[in-house]
Amino acid sequence: EILIGLVGSEMCIRDRNKRDDIQSRNMIYWQNIPYGKGGNIIAIACNNGKEVARHMLETTGKAKALKIELENADWKADGMDLQYVKVYAVDSKGRVVPATEGEVTFEVSGEARLIAVDNGDHMTDELFSGNHKKLHQGFVMAILRSSQTSGNVKIKASLKGLKSAEKKMTTK
């Protein structure tokens, strides 16, 4: 079963759907949850009365800045190694703001080059090439390829109206 609701208010319970009921087996529908009024929504999954998973979504503020996260801590200068640079639109508390729209522009300097940009939106026909990409769910990614020379790399992500983000890395 799943319990869901706003933190501090009454939780709604949803029993497991019957697998032989074609109408509802893959449907999750909740009633009486006051969406859109702010606060934190929590979902708790239970199996035989024991909690097995928990997830919480927080209401965010307005996007204020971009934030960069790197995937590869050990980046090799072999001309083939990739660095996945994740960029998020965040509020003043650092929370991702999924409703943020706009196009992020990337600037890369040093011992790497920008080879692709993506945002995870499967419904777009935008190309992966270029140095800019629209945010999707507050997210965009740049993919960098190292050169064959060890050295420093700098990437900057900017979006009009938000504070830019910059990250320095080293290839070895």
Please tell me what each predicted stretch does.
Residues 50-61, 163-172:
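Edge beta-strands of extracellular beta-sandwich domains
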Residues 28-35, 127-148:
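Short, hydrophobic beta-strand segments
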Residues 36-40, 80-82, 150-152:
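Extracellular Ig-like/FN3 beta-sandwich strand-entry sites
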Residues 60-76:
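Low-complexity, acidic Ser/Thr/Pro/Gly-rich terminal tails and inter-domain linkers that flank the onset
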Residues 44-48, 158-162:
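Beta-strand-rich extracellular modules
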Residues 80-98, 104, 154-157:
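Beta-strand-rich structural segments
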Residues 1-8, 12-13:
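Single conserved hydrophobic/aromatic residue that forms the stacking wall/gate
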Residues 64-68, 107-123:
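Short aromatic-acidic-glycine turn motif
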